């Protein structure tokens, strides 16, 4: 039953409806608010999914990457324009010459789907993609000591196979960034859930 429910999330309009119904959209909006983006900024969104939060952005130059064709097709049809580009590709070092340096890189709900080595690679490339003064922000399902039973169940049954404690995410980020900090978010979704919001600045490489 749980596997069937997860499979339904591949249906893009249903996924978007569920995200909003559960309050997960507010989690992403909180990340965007952290960045205080302005018109003309460049944003790279890795693992953008259907990018349903695009309408909350100012008039930025946006590059969204995801490996799910249905998500990218939805995003292109909805938001594609001369300032918003969506690519069904794995974001990597080869893209650094194709997009301008970023004022912000978004990793929203991505790292808990990636192994440690995959996460290291994404974080290294994200660090290299930043313009001077640029920032990376990530948010992921996490484990944390204060979790109640429902929240822990949500972490145990997340679609991501690499849900970590905050220290695990932070250790990976510190390999690529001089400044890393974060906070546990557990008050935005309608079902009790715990998330690690992580801010990264000053690339080491």
Task: Report residues per predicted region.
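Short glycine-dipeptide loop
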Residues: 130-136
């Amino acid at each position: 039953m749980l596997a069937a429910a997860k499979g339904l999330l591949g249906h893009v309009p249903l996924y978007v409806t569920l995200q909003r119904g559960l309050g997960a959209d507010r989690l992403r909006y909180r990340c965007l608010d952290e960045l205080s983006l302005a018109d003309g900024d460049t944003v790279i969104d890795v693992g953008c999914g259907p990018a349903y939060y695009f309408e909350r952005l100012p008039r930025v130059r946006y590059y969204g990457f995801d490996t799910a064709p249905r998500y990218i097709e939805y995003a292109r049809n909805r938001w594609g324009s001369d300032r918003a580009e969506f690519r069904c590709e794995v974001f990597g070092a080869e893209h650094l010459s194709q997009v301008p340096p970023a004022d912000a890189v978004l990793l929203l709900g991505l790292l808990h789907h990636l192994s440690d080595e995959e996460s290291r690679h994404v974080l290294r490339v994200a660090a290299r993609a930043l313009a001077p003064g640029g920032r990376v922000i990530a948010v992921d399902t996490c484990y944390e000591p204060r979790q109640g039973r429902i929240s822990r169940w949500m972490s145990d049954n997340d679609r991501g196979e690499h849900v970590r404690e905050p220290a695990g995410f932070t250790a990976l980020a510190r390999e690529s960034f001089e400044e890393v900090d974060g906070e546990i978010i557990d008050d935005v979704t309608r079902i009790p859930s715990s998330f690690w919001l992580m801010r990264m600045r000053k690339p080491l490489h």
